[in-house]
Amino acid sequence: YRGPSNVLWRVGEGAWDSKKITDSLKALPTYGPLRPAGVTPADPQEAVAMMADGTSVSLRMEGVRWARPYRSDTLQGPTPRKVTDVVQTGQQIWVRQVGDAWWLAQVPDVNSALVSINPQNGAVMALVGGFDFNQSKFNRATQALRQVGSNIKPFLYTAAMDKGLTLASILNDVPIS
């Protein structure tokens, strides 16, 4: 977990009133199921988070247990033992509903693309160009200028096998004139 998106107010500086919290949250976008929220009170067992519409939701330990602190690409901190190890009063966080419960969430730092093709007829079954169109209008599946790298090998090898080539086949790799 990379931490809160913002600190709305610090404990000891005077808490914001409900209108100020909701006005701040209404200015933020939603990303798919992720909703911005402001942590009002937080204690070791539970944090209450106010949503942009003024409703409050409860974050319990099962909804924050996953949020080990991010240290580096290869290292995470310890598993939290209480809710306040993860969130504090005054922080702006992201939450999502899981069943009847609300869980802490975060907007991903990375995006990727996916093109799913039906191998029977070559039809495109799904094409995903990123995490959320409202976050980034750039479609990584159709607009990226990167080379496909090894992702294309299964298609090339399958086509070669369909033509009768094997792993032992020798091909003369000279320019065609």
Predicted feature descriptions by range:
Residues Y1-S177:
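Extended, non-catalytic substrate-recognition/exosite surfaces adjacent to catalytic cores, especially
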